[in-house]
Regions:
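Solvent-exposed, polar/charged alpha-helical surfaces in well-ordered, non-transmembrane soluble domains
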Residues: 22, 61, 65, 94, ...
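Short acidic catalytic loops
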Residues: 27-31, 103-119, 170
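Extracellular/periplasmic catalytic domains that process cell-envelope and extracellular macromolecules
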Residues: 19-23, 66-70, 75, 105-107, ...
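Substrate-binding surface in catalytic domains of secreted glycosidases
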Residues: 3-7, 36-54, 115-206
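Glycan-recognition patch characteristic of GH18 chitinases/ENGases
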Residues: 1-102, 179-182
């Protein structure tokens, strides 16, 4: 499986070719950030030299046209924002999940990826795991659901691992210590030993 992130600013600068888009099985648009109570804040791309899409909906529409005829999934990506406060509150977790589902339904999207960086202690891992479980509960099995983890932050609960369709592992940086192939392989082995099934693991490359 080839899963790729699409950010509007890079796309508008011509850094993502149509060939690359069409070669991907899964395209994730990092366009939404959670507020602490669960509402969504959308990030619109900036035009480059007066050209390019300037709304997240327009960006998705543009890419959808370029991958027409392929089996590529078109998904929403959630990141940053007040995610730690949101996942720590049961009502906010539910509101967030329901809001995501509404966006997926309205825009005919194939699913959601959570890229929340980073849980730093046991409580934050527990809260994040509960948010993952709530998202699956609200979405059901209709939508493709993944999370993005990192070798320094991957210890979500076993139930959360079971709840997602796959997990992408950012085992390529940003620290240069992760650049050697030996470190790349050992990071992958580490999360496998933790309990992430190999059939659910998508190892990242820069």
């Amino acid at each position: 499986m080839i899963s790729s992130y699409v950010r509007g600013h890079f796309y508008n600068r011509g850094r993502i070719s149509t060939e690359s888009l069409r070669a991907s099985d899964d395209l994730i648009f990092l366009s939404v950030h959670p507020n602490k109570d669960g509402p969504l804040l959308f990030e619109n791309p900036r035009a480059f030299q007066g050209k390019g899409e300037t709304t997240w909906e327009g960006l998705i529409k543009s890419v959808r046209g370029k991958v027409k005829g392929t089996k590529a999934k078109i998904r929403l990506g959630a990141s940053s924002g007040e995610w730690k406060a949101m996942v720590a509150d049961e009502a906010a977790r539910t509101t967030f999940a329901k809001n995501i589902k509404k966006v997926l339904e309205k825009n005919n999207l194939d699913g959601i990826d959570l890229d929340f960086e980073w849980a730093e202690n046991e409580k934050e891992y527990e809260d994040y795991s509960l948010a993952i479980l709530k998202m699956r509960e609200v979405l059901g099995d209709k939508y493709l659901f993944s999370v993005s983890l990192h070798p320094v932050c991957y210890k979500i609960s076993k139930k959360a691992i079971e709840a997602v369709d796959f997990i992408s592992l950012q085992c390529y940086g940003p620290s240069p210590v992760r650049f050697p192939i030996e470190k790349y392989c050992s990071d992958i082995q580490m999360v496998l030993e933790y309990g992430i099934p190999k059939e659910k693991l998508v190892a990242g490359v820069p």
